[in-house]
């Protein structure tokens, strides 16, 4: 049986696994490893510790579809809309720039529901808290080691983690990647930011006319979302679910600070924008070290083949 490993349980990894299952008709074993404790990657949805049905998107807030990708990826959008995974964004987002021909969507069940859908379609065996440390070439197969020291062999490995993490891998991969590819990977850069989710008591109201707002005059906060209102999932069972995204400069400056200190700073700034908020019943602070790509690998749009036989691919 042909064995495939996909590293990374975000959108790229889950969709890649689903497409492999669809396109490969031969017997196929699909494994998906992620070093995190949950799936989603930059499409993470957090649950309230008091009520798991109360959720907040800490990563991507909505999906923007340009006319180009509406045509190129039409089947994907139609499929997700047909299954109720995506819905048109109808709630007001103050300060959002809407370009001609663009469409915006939200995931009513949380943005991680997109990843869950594709993982289910893929039939992949998912392993969390499994961090790849080495990739070696053994008898024309990839021997992949994780941080506990255990190894498994695969016929094909697809890496979907951030480029700096690939450059940190040990083993034969160090010498198998060409110097040109290494330079391309090293040139990839990312923005960094924090997200703070605040879960409030059921029955509490945040009386503002918007579901989300871009902030332009605060050194700390760039975006605020009343997440349940944005996704049209407000209910008497859950209180408001407030999500705050910081500015990139704030994220870079405080990247190595403790989450407790960062959360306190964000909360102080939030009070200046939405004064009088009661204490939340729970919070979740999330560091996005690799938030968005600001500089992609030159001449390798979308993917890079690191080794041909057997295949080792970076997407």
Curated annotation (Swiss-Prot):
Question: Which residue positions does the secretion signal occupy?
Answer: 1-17
User: Which InterPro entries does the UniProt entry name for this protein?
Assistant: Amino_oxidase (IPR002937), FAD/NAD-bd_sf (IPR036188), RNLS (IPR040174)
Cellular component GO terms held in the UniProt record: extracellular region; extracellular space
Q: Enzyme class, one word?
A: oxidoreductase
Gene Ontology BP terms: cardiac left ventricle morphogenesis; dopamine metabolic process; epinephrine metabolic process; heart contraction; negative regulation of blood pressure; negative regulation of heart rate; norepinephrine metabolic process; phosphate ion homeostasis
Query: Per its Swiss-Prot or TrEMBL entry, what cofactor is needed?
Result: FAD
Give the UniProt keywords, A-Z: FAD, Flavoprotein, NAD, NADP, Oxidoreductase, Secreted, Signal
The family classification in the record reads:
Belongs to the renalase family.
Q: Tell me what this protein is called.
A: Renalase
For this protein's source organism, the top of the classification is: Eukaryota, Metazoa, Chordata, Craniata, Vertebrata
What gene codes for this chain? Rnls
């Amino acid at each position: 049986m042909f064995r495939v490993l996909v590293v990374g349980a975000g959108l790229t990894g889950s969709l890649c696994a689903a497409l492999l299952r669809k396109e490969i008709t031969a017997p196929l074993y699909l494994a998906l490893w992620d070093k995190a404790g949950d799936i989603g990657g930059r499409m993470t949805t957090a649950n309230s510790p008091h009520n798991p049905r109360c959720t907040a998107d800490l990563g991507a807030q909505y999906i923007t579809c340009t006319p180009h990708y509406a045509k190129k990826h039409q089947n994907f959008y139609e499929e997700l809309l047909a299954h109720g995974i995506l819905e048109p964004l109808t709630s007001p987002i103050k300060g959002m720039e809407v370009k001609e021909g663009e469409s915006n969507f939200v995931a009513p069940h949380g943005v991680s529901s997109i990843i869950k859908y594709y993982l289910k379609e893929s039939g992949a065996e998912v392993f969390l808290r499994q961090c790849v440390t080495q990739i070696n070439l053994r008898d024309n197969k990839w021997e992949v080691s994780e941080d506990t020291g255990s190894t498994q062999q695969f016929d094909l490995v697809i890496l979907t983690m951030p480029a700096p993490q690939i450059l940190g891998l040990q083993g034969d991969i160090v010498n198998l990647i060409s110097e040109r590819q290494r330079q391309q990977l090293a040139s990839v850069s990312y923005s960094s930011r924090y997200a703070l989710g605040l879960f409030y008591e059921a029955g509490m109201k945040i009386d503002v006319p918007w579901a989300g707002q871009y902030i332009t005059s605060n050194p700390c906060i760039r975006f605020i979302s009343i997440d349940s209102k944005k996704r049209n999932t407000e209910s008497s069972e859950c209180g408001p679910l407030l999500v705050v995204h910081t500015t990139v400069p704030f994220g870079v400056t405080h990247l190595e600070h403790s989450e407790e200190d960062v959360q306190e700073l964000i909360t102080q700034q939030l009070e200046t924008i939405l004064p009088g908020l009661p204490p939340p019943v729970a919070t979740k602070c999330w560091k996005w070290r690799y938030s968005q790509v600001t500089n992609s690998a030159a001449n390798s749009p979308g993917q890079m083949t690191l080794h041909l036989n057997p295949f080792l691919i970076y997407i």
